[in-house]
Design a protein with these regions (language model features):
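Glycine-rich phosphate-binding loops of nucleotide-dependent enzymes
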Residues: 1-258
Length: 258
């Protein structure tokens, strides 16, 4: 079942054309890698999906509804969630405070009027969310700034899940992580897929993309240059598509950088 459908998406900033008629479909529960060199249009495309940017032309349908005219908040309520590379965590606060930031459950005074933040309930729900992910954190009462990069990624994913998303867009989730933490994050992505949540994975780490995705879409100069079934492709083909095909020296150099 198609969850997200983009047709002929174009986006310009002044005289600069960034997206040139991009088509993209994502099925429910599918993990799709979005790859391409810097400047290929990945960030612009993702911000067009989330509503931060408005497409100049084309159509965007999500879960059967036209969302082209909706703002980011409306799209989020429909089930589109994005985890940015910087994670946007309040690092001086603990796990529950980050997960419920701005949406804290409250206790009712005398059983009638909402009053104080219910920290105990926040902690209970946060613990259940981390358990749902099959992840481990040192303590939900510690500031997330004391956590490793992979543990912080876990908190960001848990926060995204509280919005009951149907699609989670992840921007470079394994960048600068140790090998063990990379595997933990990839396992979290697999867990999302097992729950029927679609994932768009933006990454320059092609080994990670190949290990966890169902399909790989290559953006090149603002166009969807290739849509590959992961099981039927390999590193060489993906790199060749990224650099334009046929340039063996450039492909080898790109693979060494990745």
């Amino acid at each position: 079942m198609t969850l997200l459908s983009l047709r002929n998406i174009r986006k310009s900033f002044g005289a600069v054309d960034v997206l040139h008629g991009v088509d993209l479909t994502i099925a429910a529960g599918e993990v799709v890698g979005l790859v391409g060199d810097n400047g290929a249009g990945k960030s612009t495309l993702m911000k067009t999906i989330t509503g931060i940017y408005r497409a100049d032309t084309g159509s965007i349908e999500f879960d059967g509804s036209d969302i082209l005219g909706l703002d980011p908040g409306q799209r989020r309520r429909l089930g589109i969630e994005m985890i940015y590379q910087d994670l946007s965590l309040a690092k001086q606060q603990d796990v529950a405070s980050n997960i419920f930031l701005g949406r804290e459950p409250t206790k009712k005074l005398f059983g009638l009027v909402p009053g104080f933040v219910d920290k105990a309930e926040m902690d209970r729900q946060a613990s259940r969310m981390i358990e749902r992910l099959g992840a481990h954190l040192p303590s939900i009462n510690r500031s997330v700034g004391s956590f490793s990069g992979g543990q912080q990624q876990t908190v960001a994913i848990a926060r995204a899940l509280t919005f009951n998303p149907k699609l989670v867009i992840m921007d470079e989730p394994t960048a600068a992580l140790a090998v063990r933490e990379v595997q933990s994050v990839l396992d979290l992505i697999r867990r999302l897929r097992s729950e029927g949540i679609a994932v768009i994975l933006i990454s320059h780490r092609l080994n990670d993309v190949l290990s966890v995705t169902d399909r790989i879409v290559v953006l090149r100069h603002g166009r969807a240059d290739a849509d590959l079934v992961t099981a039927n492709t390999n590193m060489n083909e993906v790199v060749s598509r990224i650099v334009g095909g046929g340039d063996i020296a450039a492909a080898a150099a790109h693979e060494q950088r990745g």
